[in-house]
């Protein structure tokens, strides 16, 4: 949800349009996915759930709730619970977007371009660590960039193409991420213990958003999980947007 394709602030009619769109959790997303593949496609025992970043967090949630009927999960560069540090980083990115006068508390008549650019510059700073950016690895992404400014302009264009309320909706889902926040479980530890399907957890060794160290206690709390750290200089993007490790 909130991607702009499925139900989102940008395509939902009043009274739940724009900033009035309800908060969506990862469990809301995976339950809708389960309904789609089981009722529409007739898939009741999926072989694998693989996801990167927010998709990795969804993979953990899927495993906690639907692991018994799934062959396995592979979370790439994500955690079962959003850390406080990660939450604060996202809060800063949200505020950067919302500080645009044209944002108008979400009731904008045209895209808040300055706010979207401010978000882009803030968030993009987290994609590589210091060494990755200093070595110019960001210039190797996609078809390559001449310099850092052209890289930033590309990212600005990418994030600028997303509706601001949709983007904020996805960030809200990310911030609320915690597999323990479900009526079936009392806490995160209990939810981790319920991921009975095989799990291959693959963090990036240089990820600033989801450091590999945060997956260590999560994997220890899962009955059938293995941790394989991707040894890379490509930060968060090693899990899904970089063709080079």
Q: Which positions does each model-derived feature cover?
A:
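Gly/Pro-rich cap/lid or specificity-loop segments adjacent to the active site
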Residues: 1-57, 64, 68-90
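Alpha/beta-hydrolase-fold enzymes
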Residues: 69-157
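Active-site nucleophile elbow and catalytic-triad environment of alpha/beta-hydrolase enzymes
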Residues: 151-154, 169-191
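Conserved alpha/beta-hydrolase "acid-adjacent" motif
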Residues: 184, 208-214
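Short, conserved loop/helix-junction motifs that constitute active-site signature segments
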Residues: 192-196, 220-223
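Short beta-strand/loop motif that positions the catalytic acidic residue
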Residues: 195, 201-203
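Short glycine-rich catalytic loops that host catalytic nucleophiles or stabilize transition states
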Residues: 205, 228-234
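Catalytic histidine-centered segment of alpha/beta-hydrolase-like enzymes
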Residues: 233-244
């Amino acid at each position: 949800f909130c991607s702009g394709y499925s139900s989102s602030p940008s395509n939902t009619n009043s009274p739940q349009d724009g900033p009035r769109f309800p908060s969506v959790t990862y469990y809301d997303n995976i339950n809708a996915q389960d309904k789609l593949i089981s009722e529409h496609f007739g898939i009741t025992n999926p072989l694998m759930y693989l996801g990167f970043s927010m998709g990795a967090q969804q993979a953990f949630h899927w495993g906690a709730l639907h692991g018994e009927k799934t062959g396995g999960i592979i979370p790439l560069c994500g955690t079962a619970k959003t850390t406080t540090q990660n939450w604060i980083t996202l809060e800063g990115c949200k505020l950067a977007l919302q500080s645009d006068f044209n944002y108008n508390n979400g009731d904008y008549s045209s895209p808040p371009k300055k706010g979207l650019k401010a978000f882009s510059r803030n968030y993009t700073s987290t994609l590589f660590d210091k060494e990755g950016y200093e070595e110019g690895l960001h210039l190797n992404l996609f078809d390559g960039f001449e310099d850092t400014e052209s890289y930033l302009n590309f990212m600005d264009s990418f994030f600028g193409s997303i509706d601001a309320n949709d983007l904020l909706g996805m960030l809200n889902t990310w911030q609320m991420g915690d597999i323990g926040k479900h009526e079936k479980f009392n806490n995160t530890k209990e939810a981790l213990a319920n991921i009975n399907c095989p799990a291959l957890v693959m963090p990036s060794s240089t990820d600033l958003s989801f450091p590999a160290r945060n997956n260590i206690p999560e994997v220890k709390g899962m009955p059938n999980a293995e941790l394989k750290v991707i040894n890379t200089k490509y930060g968060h993007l090693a899990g899904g947007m970089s063709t080079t490790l």
